[in-house]
C-alpha cells in the first residue's frame, strides 16, 4: 500500500495529508549566499530587523547577515509560531526541503511536527556544490545513493524534545541542488537521485540553476539515469522559466511544475542580476496558463521561506500566505475549488506516496 513518510512516521492514506506546502524550510544555513550590501546601506541592513530598516532588508534580503541566519533560536521560535498559524488557517502538511550542505535539522522538524500537529516530510539528497566540503564532493555516485537509501529506509537517530530517541526517516530526496552550468558533483547527485528513485519509487525534487535551460538539462540527466518523471518536482520555475511558451515546452517532459516563491515580490532579484523576480500576479497568470493547457495534475505551489524577513514575527507573510491571500485570488479568477484542491491537496499527496 502506498504511504507518505513523515518525520513522525508513515501516513497510510496520503489523501489525509490535507493542504500541503511542497517546498519550505523550517531551518537552514544560508550564510553562503550572503551578498555585500550596496555602498551606504550596510548601516541599515547589518542589524536586527526593525520598522526603520525592514524596507531595506526586503529590497536586499541577502545583504543582511542577520536575515540569512535561519537557524538560530529566534528564528526557530518564530517558525514554530508560524507553523501553528498555518495549522489554524487550514494547513495540513509541509515538505521541508533542507538537504545535505545547508544543515538539515531533523530534531527541530520532529519537535515542530509534534507541537503543531502538522505533518512534516524531511528530505535527503545534496544541495549545490558550493556549500559542500571536499569530503562530500569526493563521494562516489554509489556512496551518495547508499546514503539516500539509508535515510529513506532506515532513518537517522535523533533525540527529541521529550528526551527520547527516535529514528526519523526521510520521505523524499531533495532539494537536490544544481548551479548553472551544472558541476560534476551536481551531476553525480542527480544521477544518484535518479538511481535511488528508480529502485525505491520515491519522490524527488530539484533546485535548478538560474537559467531557463537548467530545468530541462536536469530532467535530461535524471531520466537518462533511470528516474521517473511522474515522481519528480522541478522547483522555482516561477523565477527560472519566465516565458509561457518555454514553460509549456518544459511541461511536456512530465514532471511536476512548481511555483514556490509566492510572497516574494521585489523590484531587484539579488541572486540573479540579469533576471527579475515575478510577482504573485505573474505566478497566478502562469498557473492559469498551465491549467488552460491541461496540466492541472502537474502544478504545485509553495513559498520557499528561507530568510527571517518572510516570517510574520519579522514583518513577513509566513507559511499561511497562500491560504490567506492567494486562494481567494484564484477563486476570483474563476478557478474552482476542485481545481484548487487538486493543486494543493491531491497533487502533493500523489507525488509523495511511495511503497516502502
Curated annotation (Swiss-Prot):
InterPro entries: AryldialkylPase_Zn-BS (IPR017947), Metal_Hydrolase (IPR032466), Phosphotriesterase (IPR001559). Gene3D superfamilies: Metal-dependent hydrolases (3.20.20.140). One of its GO terms (molecular function) is hydrolase activity, acting on ester bonds. Pfam families: PTE. One of its GO terms (biological process) is catabolic process. Coiled coil: none annotated. It comes from the Eukaryota. A divalent metal cation 1 binds at residues 23, 25, 175, 304. Keywords: Hydrolase, Metal-binding. Its EC number is 3.1.-.-. Its cofactor is a divalent metal cation. Binds 2 divalent metal cations per subunit. A divalent metal cation 2 binds at residues 175, 207, 236. Belongs to the metallo-dependent hydrolases superfamily. Phosphotriesterase family. PANTHER family: PHOSPHOTRIESTERASE-RELATED, PHOSPHOTRIESTERASE-RELATED PROTEIN. This is Phosphotriesterase-related protein. It comes from Aedes aegypti.
Amino acid at each position: 500500500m502506498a504511504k507518505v513518510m513523515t518525520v513522525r512516521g508513515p501516513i497510510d492514506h496520503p489523501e489525509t495529508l490535507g493542504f500541503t506546502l511542497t517546498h519550505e524550510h523550517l531551518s537552514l544555513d544560508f550564510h553562503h549566499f550572503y551578498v555585500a550590501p550596496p555602498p551606504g546601506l550596510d548601516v541599515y541592513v547589518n542589524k536586527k530587523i526593525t520598522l526603520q530598516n525592514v524596507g531595506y532588508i526586503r529590497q536586499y534580503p541577502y545583504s543582511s547577515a542577520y536575515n540569512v541566519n535561519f537557524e538560530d533560536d529566534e528564528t526557530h521560535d518564530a517558525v514554530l509560531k508560524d507553523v501553528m498559524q498555518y495549522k489554524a488557517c487550514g494547513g495540513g502538511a509541509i515538505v521541508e526541503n533542507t538537504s545535505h550542505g545547508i544543515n538539515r535539522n531533523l530534531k527541530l522538524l520532529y519537535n515542530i511536527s509534534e507541537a503543531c500537529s502538522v505533518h512534516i516530510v524531511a528530505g535527503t539528497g545534496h544541495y549545490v556544490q558550493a556549500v559542500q566540503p571536499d569530503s562530500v564532493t569526493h563521494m562516489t555516485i554509489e556512496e551518495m545513493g547508499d546514503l539516500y537509501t539509508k535515510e529513506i529506509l532506515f532513518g537517522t537517530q535523533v533525540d527529541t524534545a521529550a528526551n527520547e530517541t527516535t529514528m526519523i526517516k526521510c520521505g523524499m530526496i531533495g532539494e537536490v541542488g544544481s548551479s548553472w552550468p551544472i558541476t560534476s558533483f551536481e551531476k553525480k547527485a542527480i544521477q544518484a537521485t535518479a538511481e535511488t528513485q528508480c529502485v525505491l519509487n520515491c519522490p524527488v525534487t530539484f533546485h535548478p540553476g538560474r537559467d531557463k535551460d537548467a530545468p530541462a538539462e536536469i530532467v535530461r540527466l535524471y531520466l537518462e539515469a533511470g528516474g521517473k518523471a511522474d515522481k519528480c518536482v522541478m522547483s522555482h520555475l516561477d523565477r527560472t522559466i519566465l516565458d509561457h511558451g518555454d514553460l509549456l515546452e518544459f511541461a511536456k517532459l512530465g514532471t511536476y511544475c512548481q511555483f514556490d516563491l509566492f510572497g516574494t515580490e521585489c523590484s531587484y532579484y539579488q541572486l540573479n542580476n540579469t533576471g527579475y523576480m515575478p510577482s504573485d500576479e505573474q505566478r497566478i497568470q502562469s498557473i492559469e496558463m498551465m491549467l488552460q493547457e491541461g496540466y492541472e495534475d502537474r502544478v504545485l505551489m509553495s513559498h520557499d521561506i528561507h530568510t527571517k524577513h518572510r516570517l510574520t514575527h519579522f514583518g513577513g507573510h509566513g507559511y499561511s500566505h497562500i491560504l490567506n491571500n492567494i486562494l481567494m485570488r484564484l477563486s476570483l479568477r474563476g478557478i474552482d475549488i476542485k481545481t484548487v484542491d487538486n493543486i494543493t491537496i491531491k497533487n502533493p499527496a500523489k507525488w509523495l506516496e511511495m511503497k516502502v
